[in-house]
Curated annotation (Swiss-Prot):
Entry superkingdom: Eukaryota
Family matches, as InterPro entries: DAPIN, DEATH-like_dom_sf, HIN-200, HIN200/IF120x, NA-bd_OB-fold
Segments forming domain HIN-200: 219-416
Cellular location(s): Nucleus
SMART domains: PYRIN
PANTHER family: INTEFERON-ACTIVABLE PROTEIN 208-RELATED, INTERFERON-INDUCIBLE PROTEIN AIM2 FAMILY MEMBER
Biased composition (Basic residues): 87-102
Lineage: Eukaryota, Metazoa, Chordata, Craniata, Vertebrata
Residue spans of biased composition, Low complexity class: 152-169
Domain Pyrin: 1-87
Protein name: Pyrin and HIN domain-containing protein 1
CDD domains: Pyrin (cd08305)
Compositional bias of kind Basic and acidic residues: 220-229
Length: 420
């Protein structure tokens, strides 16, 4: 039960909030968790481990509920935590009741052997009415008739009149006058196999792949699709782009970013197990499962969440979808977007200004200018006006006066030097 509570704490409580709120939660829980200076840099997974040790009863679910009710904007998550905890309790209680009921049902069956004597069988047959006997006979008879129709279609077609009269006679015999039975749907509407559909499409001269592709190309998404919370189902995707692993905190924890796509949408992915770098190869098809959606990203923490696909079925990713997933957004487009989204792209550096704890770059394109604030480890990367910056996972911060990009914990950037 504690493991279930920890799942709620991590996937709903900690992964469901942004980085700013997470730092606030760590600060408010620092005394209870007795965080030292190094532990102040712990990520969500490690904080969940500490909470499990500190609050063995419920892994800290109640503590998060109390905190989130006091933090503006987190009331909905507090209610969600409360509901999921109640649901976990009900599930646990239901499993106990089911186990007890199954145990009670098994006890008499083991103590009383089944009787097969004629004395026990005769009273049962004596209670059967003519109607029930007809109903009992009708099922095997109809089953044999169904088998006859399905197994020998040539015989039925060669003697159509005889089959018609026989089926009508048999129909009148097996049907009860009180409760007439409808014929099986498998007889009336024979299933259409994939081979039949394929041959029909080919007869029209239009390949199925072309039809599906045309349907997929109608609406090409401009933004990555988002999923929220823990996702246990599987998703078949193709890898479009992947970065090299990099250290993202003072404890030298490593991760890498990737862009993947289905045939209709694309996703941004954060991978926190660098062993998976061997599987994330461009144009490779993978199945991902048991992941967490948060802040517009799919977060993968375990190698067991990714498996290679070798079913021989190719994925046809439209070229327009590939271009959309790799496109650098225009600055005027970013200025019109809601704040809080994360941005990838290559931008030209027009100006550089070093502040006391960060570097401010001014980037530009043919639609406008925008500031980029770079903090922490990324300030050590040498970049000058005229160079290009490849930004990965930079946040469009809330600012009423002007749009601005800012680096976060999982941001990274690369410099493309200007040609002399």
């Amino acid at each position: 039960m504690v493991n279930e509570y920890k799942r709620i704490v991590l996937l709903t409580g900690l992964m469901g909030i942004n980085d700013h709120d997470f730092r606030m939660v760590k600060s408010l829980l620092s005394k209870e968790l007795k965080l030292n200076r190094m532990q102040d840099q712990y990520d969500r997974v490690k904080i969940a481990d500490l909470m499990e040790d500190k609050f063995p009863k419920d892994a800290g679910v109640d503590q998060l509920i109390k905190l989130y009710k006091q933090i503006p904007g987190l009331g909905d998550i507090a209610n969600k935590l409360k509901n999921e905890k109640a649901k976990a309790k009900r599930t646990r209680t239901g499993k106990r009741k089911t186990a007890a009921k199954r145990q009670r049902q098994e006890e008499p069956s083991t103590s009383q052997p089944m009787s097969t004597t004629n004395e026990d069988a005769e009273p049962e047959s004596g209670r059967s009415t003519p109607d029930t006997q007809v109903a009992q006979l009708s099922l095997p008879t109809a089953s044999r008739r169904n088998q006859a129709i399905q197994i020998s279609p040539t015989i039925a077609s060669s003697s159509g009149q005889t089959s018609s009269r026989s089926s009508e006679t048999l129909q009148s015999i097996i049907q009860s006058p009180k409760t007439p039975k409808r014929p099986s749907s498998s007889i009336l509407d024979p299933p259409v196999s994939s081979g039949t559909a394929s041959s029909s499409a080919q007869a029209l001269g239009v390949p199925l792949a072309t039809i599906a592709k045309r349907q997929r190309l109608k609406n090409v998404p401009k933004e990555p699709s988002e999923e929220n919370g823990h996702q246990q189902g599987s998703k078949k995707v193709m890898v479009l782009k992947v970065t090299e692993p990099f250290s993202y905190d003072v404890t030298e924890e490593k991760m890498f970013h990737a862009t993947v796509a289905t045939e209709t949408e694309f996703f941004r992915v954060k991978v926190f197990d660098i062993v998976l770098k061997e599987k994330f190869i461009p144009n490779k098809v993978l199945t991902i499962s048991n992941y967490v959606g948060c802040n517009g990203f799919i977060n993968i923490y375990s190698a067991s969440s990714v498996s290679e696909v070798n079913d021989g079925e190719p994925m046809n990713i439209p070229l327009s979808l590939r271009k959309s997933a790799n496109r650098t957004p225009k600055i005027n487009y970013l200025c019109s977007k809601k704040r809080g989204i994360f941005v990838n792209g290559v931008f030209t550096v027009c100006k550089k200004e070093e502040k006391w704890n960060y570097i401010c770059y001014e980037i530009g394109d043919d639609t406008g200018m925008m500031e980029v604030e770079v903090y922490g480890r990324l300030t050590n990367i040498a970049c000058n006006p005229g160079d290009k910056l490849r930004l990965i996972c930079f946040k469009l911060i809330p600012d009423e006066e002007k749009a601005q990009l800012r680096s976060t914990t999982h941001s990274n950037m690369q410099v493309i030097k200007a040609k002399n």
